From Swiss-Prot:
Keywords: Amino-acid biosynthesis, Arginine biosynthesis, Cytoplasm, Lyase. One of its GO terms (molecular function) is argininosuccinate lyase activity. It catalyses: 2-(N(omega)-L-arginino)succinate = fumarate + L-arginine. PANTHER family: ARGININOSUCCINATE LYASE. One of its GO terms (cellular component) is cytosol. NCBIfam families: argH, PRK12308.1. SUPFAM superfamilies: L-aspartase-like. This is Argininosuccinate lyase. Its EC number is 4.3.2.1. The keyword Amino-acid biosynthesis applies.
Length: 460
């Protein structure tokens, strides 16, 4: 049943229907569309457009449809309707006749779809928030399992300074906490109700938009009808939050792919999140992580696509905006999948703590400790930095670690170096000296870990 057509002499071509019809994807918003229609029917009754009996019949039929939608029992494949709005209205008319035809009084699909989409996004903010918290929990559990472990810290993918593995886990916790904050901010900004804005100019019927907004769980009605029907900032923000979070997951995946490699060998992944090779029997590939990294580009593409779509649109609604949904729906699905698989990967990993420790001590990662030691002896840091660099060069020439150089070799470079330098050059010393807020010492990391576990409990 077309929601338009009185001024047309022929129907839509099959090719036009292919490009125009959105039911194949906007069917996921069936429950939200029906929820909005129930509220609209109540508003129409209060405005004197519907009788109490008509509204009761509409709400009863809509409630039955919503129960079917929530149970996944609506048959969209057998329908030739254009979109979810016409699908629901056709079902009402089939059941109620002319009473069903009254529901759309004063309403446009423009304010209807804007309301549906906001309800859908708001619902998924809650579920995605839970998914992000799940990854945070898995990171904290991994940190707790390997609380004493020391791994190499990297800059430029070169060994730089030793850090606690838990410190690495907590770095990703910080990133994901920002993702949570962005989701919360998005909910605040997008939680306004467009319903009652009509096609673009509002409606002539005296509906109570504040009551509609409150009933649907919005903080307030949208204040400008033109903006209400043409705003897709909330979708762009959702895609940006998803893109940022997927970027964090991609970095996490990249780190773990490297740590899992034969060259590093710092950790092993569980069989449940890896795959083999059709040719090479020995292979155990980190496919879950690689796909998590690969799907990041897919999500970025959805954000870029909608930005380009929206950039040239005049006020108010344009059909271009129908292109907002497929990318957003796919993004939410992919983000959800990646968050869930990230949790599984983290829960499955086992750290090779001894190999990590050996690697953390290599690459002259204690050179900064030597420079800091010299500062303690009254040497300006820049001079100490130069001295430490020459010590590293000496160790390279002799094929040994800094701490294995005899004191005579060290003192030949600087007479400020004394026998008390050797404890300073030990692995644990350098790690635990960084006992400052945000640092990698055992004490600081333990406090941070317990604080984050406490925060997680408060999140529920």
């Amino acid at each position: 049943m077309a929601l338009w057509g009185g001024r047309f002499e022929s129907g839509a071509s099959s090719m036009f229907k292919q490009v125009n019809d959105s039911l194949p994807f906007d069917q996921v918003m069936a429950s939200q569309d029906i929820q909005g229609s129930i509220s609209w029917s109540r508003a129409l009754q209060k405005a004197g457009v519907l009788t109490a009996d008509e509204q009761a019949q509409l709400e009863g039929a809509l409630s039955e449809l919503k129960a079917q939608a929530d149970a996944g029992e609506l048959d969209f494949n057998a329908s030739s309707e254009e979109d979810i709005h016409s699908f629901v209205e056709a079902a009402l008319i089939e059941k109620l006749g002319d009473i069903g035809r009254k529901l759309h009084t004063g309403r446009s699909r423009n304010d209807q779809v804007a309301t549906d989409f906001r309800l859908w996004v708001r619902e998924h903010i809650a579920s995605l928030r839970a998914d992000v918290l799940g990854v945070i929990k898995s990171l904290l559990n991994a940190a707790s399992r390997h609380q004493e472990a020391i791994i190499p810290g990297y800059t430029h993918l070169q060994r730089a300074q030793p850090i606690h593995f838990a410190h690495w886990c907590l770095a990703y916790v910080e990133m994901l906490k920002r993702d949570l904050s962005r989701l919360d901010d998005l909910k605040v900004r997008m939680n306004q109700c467009p319903l009652g804005s009509g096609a673009l100019a509002g409606t002539t019927f005296p509906v109570d938009r504040h009551a509609i907004a409150e009933e649907l769980g919005f903080d307030s009605p949208c204040l400008n009808s033109l903006d209400a029907v043409s705003d897709r900032d909330f979708v762009l923000e959702l895609l940006f939050v998803a893109s940022t979070s997927m970027m964090h997951l991609s970095r996490l995946a990249e780190d773990m792919i490297f740590y899992n490699s034969g060259e590093a060998g710092f950790l092993q992944l569980g069989d449940s999140v890896t795959s083999g090779s059709s040719l090479m029997p020995q292979k155990k590939n980190p496919d879950a992580l690689e796909l998590m990294r690969g799907k990041c580009g897919r999500v970025f593409g959805a954000l870029q696509a909608l930005l380009v779509t929206m950039k040239g649109l005049p006020l108010a609604y344009n059909k271009d905006m129908q292109e907002d949904k497929e990318g957003a729906i796919d993004t939410v699905n992919q983000w959800h999948i990646c968050l869930c698989i990230a949790s599984e990967v983290l829960d499955s990993l086992q750290l090779n703590e001894e190999r990590c420790r050996v690697a953390a001590a290599q690459g002259f990662s204690n050179a900064t400790e030597l420079a800091d030691y010299l500062v303690g002896k009254g040497v300006p840091f820049r001079t100490g930095h130069d001295i430490a660099g020459r010590v590293v060069l000496q160790a390279i020439d002799k094929g040994c670690a800094i701490e294995d150089l005899p004191l005579s070799d060290l003192q030949a470079i600087s007479d400020k170096i004394e026998d008390d330098v050797y404890p300073v050059l030990q692995l644990e010393y350098g790690v635990n000296q960084r006992n400052i807020l945000g640092g990698t010492s055992k004490e600081t990391v333990t406090k941070a870990l317990y604080q984050e576990l406490e925060n997680l409990d408060k999140q529920g």
